[in-house]
Amino acid sequence: MTSKLPVELRSALDQARLLRARKISARELLDLCWARVEKHNPRLNAVIVSDIGRARKAAAVADKRLKAGEPRGIFDGVPMSIKESFDWTGTPTTWGDPRFAGNIAKSDAVALTRLTDQGADIFGKTNVPLMLADWQSFNAIYGTTNNPWDVTRAPGGSSGGSAVALA
């Protein structure tokens, strides 16, 4: 059954299938996802660190591989965000704790490497509560992540930013 959802709202596996079938390019898919971030993030504060330039370069490389019929892995060209607590080279990893505000990742976390080894295109990091341990997603570095369905309510803690980014 074909999904009636816009491509940027479909599952990562559906997006990967569309990319491999060349129904959409990695750059087009990234731009659709990024447009949603730009539209909704000012109100929601889910994506708190981003590197769209790096993501666009990765999308261009993925498009070349996909065009050649040589995908890197199952997620080649699929745009994704990761939780702020995972190291992503050159970006802050603070766990929402002001004591770690100057901590810049020198390498990628193992979990992130496993995603990128499969071709995932990381564009940003999502908000977390202090030390990932609260029922909501607030910290003194990045502020509060708001529930997309009712901004007066919390989206949950630990992975609240990730949940809102998906919603």
Language model: regions and residue ranges:
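An N-terminal boundary/leader segment
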Residues: 1-57, 67
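Short alpha-helix boundary/capping motifs
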Residues: 43, 61, 65, 142-144, ...
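Generic hydrophobic alpha-helical segments
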Residues: 15-19, 62, 162
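Immediate post-signal peptide segment of exported/extracytoplasmic ligand-binding proteins
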Residues: 62-79
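Conserved SET/PR domain catalytic loop and adjacent active-site segment
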Residues: 23, 70-71, 91
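Short glycine/serine-rich loop/turn segments
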Residues: 75-167
